Amino acid sequence: MAPTSATDALATADLPIRRCLELAYEALQAGGLACGSVLLDASGGVVAEGRNHAYDPPTGSQPLEGTPLAHAELNALARVATDRDLAGDTLWSSQEPCSMCTAAAAFVGVGAIAYLAPDPWALATSQSRAQEDAFAGAAGTPSVSGPVGEPWRTIANALFILSIAATRGPDHSTVARSRDLDPAALETALALLAGPRPWPPTLGGLLEPVWDVLLKAARG
């Protein structure tokens, strides 16, 4: 029987999916861009985690905090010891990693990359896929899989779009172009944007009021 609530669905979700989304929500709560990443070993154990800190005010708690390098994937990889062999590890991310993060994963020897949803920012800014395609098939490049199925894909991008709408306004180009590129995620994000503040303490609490709307939108 399918879960009837957001909280139940998250509790039964695969670990990397749940943690990527929870970390993305932590970034949203901090006023940043909702992206999360988790590195798993070959047995499915968590090696390291990270969230986007690029738009956080510098506090000294993260070396890259408040810089354009502070993507979720880089923050996760920065927690890994230099002498670790990452060939059997998988780097999960809430959105498809950008070329910088893909290159970093390849440089440190990550074996595989998996992501929940396509990157709305890259799509909305018409970023060329040529730089990502340049990595395809190159020696030492991690294998890549994604996006995942519903409702996780829609939730990942709804959080991403929501974080932009909440901090930069609903007319931001990423939000505006999502009307054509990802209407299900946009519908969910706008429903969440209209909800009460402050944000609920848990991701399940955030999604619960719009759970039925989200599932309907994800089904198309």
Tell me what each language-model feature is.
Residues 85-95:
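Immediate flanking context of iron-sulfur cluster ligation sites
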Residues 93-111:
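Local cysteine-cluster metal-coordination motifs and their immediate loop/turn environment
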Residues 2-27, 108-220:
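Zinc-dependent deaminase
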Residues 48, 71-83:
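Glycine/small-residue-rich phosphate/adenosyl-binding loop
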Residues 45-55:
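Short beta->alpha transition motifs characteristic of CBS
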Residues 30, 42-43:
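Short, ordered coil/turn segments that flank beta-strands lining enzyme active or ligand-binding pockets
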Residues 53-72:
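A short, polar/charged loop-to-alpha-helix boundary motif
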Residues 35-41:
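Short beta-strand scaffold segments in enzyme catalytic cores
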